[in-house]
Amino acid sequence: SSAASDVYKRQLFYCIQLYCDFSGGIDIPRGVARLFGIDMAENFRRPIFATSLTDYWRRWHITLGAWMRDYVFYPISLSRGFGKLSRWARTHIGGTAGKIFATSLATFIVYFIIGIWHGANFRYIAFGLWNGVLITASLLLEKTFLRWKAALHVNDKSAGWRVFMTLRTALLVFIGRYFTRAPRLRSVFTLLKTTVRHPQPVQLFDGTLWSLGLAKT
């Protein structure tokens, strides 16, 4: 149906609106501050060009990431309890997973807290967990991915590979935003299923978008 095929387009424009509102809302006071000789911290660094979720969070809401790193990640990962956990993991799990188990757990906790920071309800907690699970998994599987790239002779310096990684990251971010839009957790899967079943990408170019409330100027 038309309403069903609108789901991903509305979601796409929500992502664009979110970035423009958030980045623009920060860039305006930064620009005004520079008129008075005050250099405020950069908060966004072209996140649309990120090639991984980790890279995305280095570029998106940079001041929040820096605060979480200094006041959550380091205190947790360098605590005595996590030191013991790290030694236990090295002994009982072994391998790469054992070496980075404690660090990965601390990373997961950070993104869980980022979810709560955005809003103390299931939508934002699920959003934080989505990012935490994927980033933690990427840490644990990093060496496996490197072996696959070597076996497939992937040139990770090529423009094609960078485009692929950028689009893949954008897709993961796009899916994650469904959690913050759905009224209930079950609705997330309903929206995703609708997106897959009724994509109709041609509507991005055939003028249908104007019917969503956009006006030509």
Predicted regions and their residues:
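Membrane-embedded transmembrane alpha-helical bundles that form the catalytic cores
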Residues: 2-216
